[in-house]
Amino acid sequence: MKRIKKLLMRGILPMGVMAAGCGMAAAYDDVLKTPLERNSCMVGEHQFMLLQPNVADLVIVTTDSLPGPEEPGVLLRVAAAFTGDDLRSVCGDHVVAGELRRGYDDVTCTGHLLAVGTRVSIRPNSDLDASVATAVKGGGYLFQQCLIVEDGVGRVERIPQAIRDREAHIIYRAACIMNDGSFAVIQGIDKMYCHEFIDGLVKLGVQQALYLDMGTWAYGWYREHNGDPIVELAPHFDNTRYQSNWLVVRSCY
């Protein structure tokens, strides 16, 4: 309920949720029963999808081993860091289950996601060395990407110029820490310019946001309950087969 009220205070109306009375409470209570909560919101002329883990024992991991829909407990799978021109290497050093793995250097890596146990944070790369040490020591996970919202401020200049120069013909997705400290993956449902996407994140109450690999690498999926059929988040393009690493929300039970 608190998330819905905060959105309404900003003039952002969740799609399919009544804006007054018991109708809003009933609709939101139904959502709260799912391990992975999905909400759709209009921000200006554009529609956004928010996917948020809803119970404390869900974990966020990154992996370079492709998790399939048949794997028990996987609720969300999306591409994470950029893949290199060789279609194998991962952009930036990263940590998988406490193991440091070297990636190629790139100036676009301005931030990182750190996940240890059920704790997730998104930080600037000025903290990278300390975060890598924490991930290795705690058996955790880390990957690097463009930090496109930092401390509630949009930083569109951190998206590669080649992406910024495109017309509004692709969708965008980001891993986010909200103002209340919760984690979310937020995706634009319709096509927009990257600055429109980042402005929308800020209006939705995002404190920190890390870009996720998109374009023809955008394929991913989610489900609200363990064992449900998957809901695809983007078309399966030819480049999907070259995805090299993934951000995964996994249930502990």
What are these regions (language model features)?
Residues 1-6:
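N-terminal secretory signal peptides that target proteins for export/translocation
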